[in-house]
Amino acid sequence: MKKHIGISLFFMGCFLSLSATNYFVATNGDDSNAGTLDKPFATLQKAQSKVVPGDTVYIRGGEYRIREEQMMGGDHLRAYVFEMNKSGTQAKRICYTGYQDERPIFNLAEVKPEGKRVSVFYVSGSYLHFRNFEIIKTQVTIREHTQSECIYNQGGNHNIYENLAMHDGFYLVRGSHNLVLNCDAYNNYDPVSENGTGGNVDGFGGHPASASYTGNVFKGCRAWYNSDDGFDLIKAQAAYTI
């Protein structure tokens, strides 16, 4: 049943508009290219700058070693590697997905902003669909009580996160009607925070900061070998379905 749900959501979300544009990102791409299958972009940042509602970004397989100078934004507390602030619509989602059966991997080993929490995908946009990729080696640089996250949903509504593997977890504070489907969060530990004990990293954190942030769901997700909780709802001000 999980597979059928995922496939139907993918076709509803990513292939609804036949007039939409498809962009491609590849490890051997170049951001001066046109972003086509034959001439792909090199970075997700470039593709994100081009998309409009209904578009799909196909990420080719391979390992993408992200550099610190590629970070898109941040604030006094956080560094945003990919700032996903563009929104789709109910009828035309924006999709970011691994291409066909390929499995892209985003490696964050080199992103270590001093004194900042790392949010690899900082998602404030709505009606987005993220599918079929992996995020590894998300770094923690603060020795106090803290953590970093692979995905941080901060204000985005009606987003779908599907078939993702995350080595530093998922975190939601603001947003409604977001679906996390068939995702894995595992081996989440860092040797830096908590004065070197690294015991504060969860697999999935569902912490809606307001009673109005309703309709959020973890479905078919797995969490294991995490240094803190597999699923943490300790600060949730609204019901969260698991």
Identify the role of each PLM range.
Residues T21-Y23, K39, P104:
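Structural signal for short hydrophobic segments within the conserved structured cores
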Residues Y23-F24, Y58, D232:
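Structural recognition of the beta-strand scaffold that forms the well-ordered cores
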Residues R60-G61, R93, T97-R103, S126-K137, ...:
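Right-handed parallel beta-helix
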Residues T21-N22, P53-T56, K92-R93, D101:
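Loop/turn elements at helix/coil->beta-strand transitions in domains of secreted/extracellular proteins
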Residues M72-M84, V111-F121, R143-N153, H167-L172, ...:
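Extracellular beta-strand/beta-solenoid scaffold signature
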Residues M1-T21:
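Bacterial Sec-dependent N-terminal signal peptides
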Residues T27-I66, V81-F82:
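Acidic Gly/Asp/Thr-rich repetitive segments characteristic of extracellular carbohydrate-active
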Residues G61, R65-G74, V81-H145:
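Right-handed parallel beta-helix/beta-spiral solenoid domain characteristic of secreted/periplasmic
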